[in-house]
């Protein structure tokens, strides 16, 4: 038995497979053939897409329904009638989850039957390339005009879905709109003309596609030359603000036309045209200000101007504020001009400068005018004294409390006599007795008294003898840098008690270190190289570094030389040193000599009498306690 041929076996088996009834049944089934529809002329399915995600969703297999999974859909829009096919690009559907952009296309009715049929992949690519080339080279290949969606009301989508029940006004509509002279506004907020209505009557196709695909062609889209469509960016001087379902009034002057609807926010405008604002409150206020307006029109501008006195501007319009308006009476109209308004009269020749509202605004343009505020605070001088249109009030206290810049605004009448406040009288027997002496010697002793040291007490409360002010019989003043001080006029009782306690222990505690024994007043400021015979030392000085040549040395200040009782070091007193005692030294008596004299007699009463006599004789000398107390009283009177 031979081996069968392999080729023969395979051929026989293949023939048997084709002749099988199963294979014949499969062949008898009708094949699925792709439908090749005719190419439409005016239907745009897509542009040249650059993103792979969008191209994969659009150009899918011909056997599948591309419109089922695609993000394209068709809408009917009957509210907009245009004379030619227009593609509207640039607005986002609010209800779409993919945030797609909208394209509105006008086509013939006979061309819409093939919209839902899929097209081959190659034809879709060729159509997109042809459309891109036609748009790039400016050819009108598919009879399509590109218009931004900003120029069309965005309530079209809502009308399609809800049957025209809901209406929304887009913010983009306030930026660009049509000329109200060429177009009419219907109740739905759609702009159209009679010519456009005659040519209309066809449905519109709405196709959605991605934002990224549209932005690539925003600069390639040719701008229309139709005079009915124009952009605000191309003609910035010609614009209008259109608002849906609002009555508006328009005024034209030059090439500027502005419309402001009721309830719209205030807008700062820099153009020179007149602006009309429709507001019931504004019109009511304008009727009251009819006599004040330079023109006969009963309109005003409710806005905030940040530049009141800008050069080259036209007439200022008075800014109104219901809370800050002054009453329109003869007082406010015939008010006397303030010096601030009279400083520069050259500006009033060209521009009419109106008063700035008395409000404090955001840009510091409403500060209170000092001249006006100062006039309101003036008080009336005489009852019934009036002037033709207003009454000026004046108060003497305002003259002293008003700053220098506002004193010129005060009005002073010739019949008013301004009395100066009377001088304060100081009572006291000691002050009355020494008043004549003070006037003569005050000028001589001020320099010496002003040069004395001031206290710097910290813990003594300025009630001890080592406080310079307390020991000199003076109160602490401003030059002192003491802390917790009680040596002040308000604590006078406490100061006097402290002095009495110290005098009880040492009667000579507050006595000057140099006293005069003569009954006549001797000029001690005459330069003399010798110690006067009429002076005697009680304690002496304790100078260390000054050399007794400065005025805080007691001996040098009183014009006497230092004695043996002085404990100074390096004495250079020009009135006499310790070793330069002259013939007049016999007249100088030290405390030790007085102690010996009092000790010999042993009479304490005589000692007190002599001390009192010496105190009476030194009352008229500068630097004494009485003289210093007199100076302190004069200082208190000035306070």
Curated annotation (Swiss-Prot):
**GO MF annotations for this entry?**
DNA-binding transcription factor activity; metal ion binding
Q: What is known of its domains?
A: The cysteine-rich domain CRC binds zinc in vitro.
Major subcellular location class: nucleus
Stretches with biased composition (Polar residues) = 329-345
UniProt superkingdom: Eukaryota
Using the record's annotation, list all stretches that form the CRC domain. Answer: 451-576
The protein's location, in the record's own words, is: Nucleus
Query: Where is the stretch described as Disordered?
Result: 282-301, 313-347
Query: Which taxonomic lineage does the organism of this UniProt entry have?
Result: Eukaryota, Viridiplantae, Streptophyta, Embryophyta, Tracheophyta
Protein family according to the UniProt entry: Belongs to the lin-54 family.
Its gene? TCX4
Gene Ontology CC: one annotated term = nucleus
- This one is known as Protein tesmin/TSO1-like CXC 4
Its BP terms in the Gene Ontology are: regulation of DNA-templated transcription
Enumerate the UniProt keywords alphabetically.
Answer: Developmental protein, Metal-binding, Nucleus, Zinc
Described purpose of this protein according to its UniProt entry = Plays a role in development of both male and female reproductive tissues.
